Amino acid sequence: MLRVDNLVVGRGAGPVVRVGQVTAAPGEAVLLVGPSGAGKTTALLALAGLAPIHSGKAWLGDIDLTALDPRGRDRLRASAMGFVFQDLHLVAGLSALDNVLLAPCAAGSAPDAPRARALLDSIGLADLAHRPAERLSRGQAQRVAIARAMLMRPRLVLADEPTASLDDQACETTLSLLLQAARDTGAALVIATHDGRLRQRGLKVVETEPMS
């Protein structure tokens, strides 16, 4: 379970945004909402140990995220977190399957090709497993990013504007796949978004509070 209690995070030396009370059980999703530039991405980076936390607390299970040293943050990020970035960071010349398999390589773990193939199958991309990422549509590439985020069976998945630039059908498909993948994996899911369409799903919503 992810728990956040009045977290104030920033970029550099100064606080940027406050996130109040957040709880997300395994398989549960929370929308972190606010206008563009309101610090949502910074809040995600702080949960990942990549942006400074100025005050407040956050726990993943019984691990106090605010008490970890840099090495501990790196280990936890590699072993227990998955990410779906707005810029998907797929390697254009690699296949969909090989892009999914980058996750364990980055974490220093052995690749799990059978699980990667099963994930691609579960999101409807089994037939495109060997297609280069540069030949995938935006929606297909987004699915590959979701599969990559789930490969290591993370306890926490952080998604930054996962439906940006998608039409209504692709938005619905992407969100449904992301929610289902989190449930199947048992991962708490935090989605930073200013896409009003996501609110229609009745998910838990937390507003960010800009500090400036």
Predicted segment positions?
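Helix-to-loop junction immediately C-terminal to a conserved catalytic motif
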Residues: 48
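Conserved ABC transporter NBD signature motif
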Residues: 56-64
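Conserved ABC ATPase signature
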Residues: 132-136, 140-142
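Conserved ABC ATPase "signature" region
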Residues: 64, 111-128
